[in-house]
Design a protein with these regions (language model features):
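Bacterial Sec-dependent N-terminal signal peptides
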Residues: 1-27
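Central antiparallel beta-sheet cores of small beta-barrel/beta-sandwich binding domains
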Residues: 25-235
Length: 235
């Protein structure tokens, strides 16, 4: 009986450890892998239009279990006339350079944050701020077309702001290995099958890439994914 209990204890311990180390990536993980400084909430109204419009194309992105190359291009990002915390978005997507599909949607503000200490050795000028903002997003493709669905998730973007000016897009942590910005972490759900797949993209890196990105200082897709639209990175 004692041996049986010991065996069950060992089995339970292995199962627990496996569960602990196999937790799915979360948006909090995305924040931790992007931000290299302490921060706190920043309760202020910010006009994020210039920040969000700074980068509209040339994101790295993937979709599905095979990490097929996903390209996202924004053609229009503007403020909602009805809600100051919502930005109306238009653009198009393609997968492995095929199936170009237009979408419309929104970025909805969640929170602003500011860094509590300078990100460089040199202190900021009086009144200047560095920080980031988080948004939820939903991008809806044309349901009348084949192979279409809805992109949905959360996003963060880094910015800097001089005193009495609007924030601007900023690569604050450009000196770090694995630098990244404008990180979209989410899913795509097919209208037809209702199946949901991972679909994420970003500047310089893709959030929660797991074994996909082998690079340290640079973005390098693993060889087993080259056939899914990443041939240009073949080495």
């Amino acid at each position: 009986m004692k041996k049986l209990l010991n065996r069950w204890f060992c089995y339970a311990l292995v199962l627990l450890c496996s569960t602990m180390y196999a937790q799915p990536c979360t948006f909090n993980d995305v924040i931790e892998r992007t931000i290299y400084s302490s921060y706190k909430k920043y309760n202020a109204d910010l006009d994020m239009l210039a920040v969000l419009n700074y980068k509209k194309t040339d994101f790295y992105g993937f979709i599905g279990v095979n990490r097929k190359r996903l390209r996202i291009t924004f053609t229009s990002i503007k403020k909602s006339e009805e809600n100051k915390d919502v930005y109306e978005v238009e653009g198009f997507s393609s997968v492995m350079n095929k199936n170009k599909r237009t979408f419309k949607g929104t970025f909805s503000l969640q929170s602003h944050y500011k860094f509590t200490e300078p990100t460089f050795e040199e202190p900021l000028k009086n009144g200047d701020i560095e920080g980031f903002s988080t948004f939820s997003y939903q991008l809806t493709e044309d349901e009348k077309l084949s192979a279409t669905g809805v992109f949905k998730g959360e996003m963060l973007v880094l910015w800097s702001k001089e005193a009495n000016k609007k924030p601007i897009y900023s690569n604050i942590f450009f000196y770090t290995d694995g630098e990244r910005n404008y990180q979209f972490f989410g899913t795509w759900t097919s209208y037809k099958t209702k199946k949901t797949s991972v679909a994420s993209w970003g500047v310089y890196r893709i959030p929660c890439s797991d074994d996909f990105d082998e690079g340290v200082g640079d973005f390098i897709p693993a060889p087993k994914y080259w056939q899914y639209g990443w041939e240009e990175f073949r080495y």
